[in-house]
Amino acid sequence: MPAKPAQDFFSLDANGQREALIIIKKLQCKILYSDKYYDDMFEYRHVILPKDLARLVPTSRLMSEMEWRQLGVQQSQGWVHYMIHKPEPHVLLFKRPRT
């Protein structure tokens, strides 16, 4: 029988989400934030999640701001999760327009 694929946080039932919130609270202080870097149009940053927290990230779609905040990511408003980096799913890539 094939192994059941892991579910991301947003696919879990209420009990699963409660258990996941304990993990999120425990690991939130271990989230690493890059310095910002720029091109002509955008500023960028990447966020590195602990591997146990990264298991809760959806792998087939980008997250809304509300969703990545639920996973414990803390940054100012306006950042957009813009790309999934398949080789390193624990690295979240964000951008926002330059001001």
Curated annotation (Swiss-Prot):
Name the record gives this protein: Cyclin-dependent kinases regulatory subunit
Family under the similarity heading: Belongs to the CKS family.
Known partners and oligomeric status: Forms a homohexamer that can probably bind six kinase subunits.
Keywords recorded for this protein, A-Z: Cell cycle, Cell division
Biological process terms in GO annotation: cell division
One GO molecular-function entry: cyclin-dependent protein serine/threonine kinase regulator activity
Free-text function comment from the UniProt entry: Binds to the catalytic subunit of the cyclin dependent kinases (Cdc2) and is essential for their biological function.
Top-rank taxon, per record: Eukaryota
InterPro entries, per the entry: Cyclin-dep_kinase_reg-sub (IPR000789), Cyclin-dep_kinase_reg-sub_sf (IPR036858)
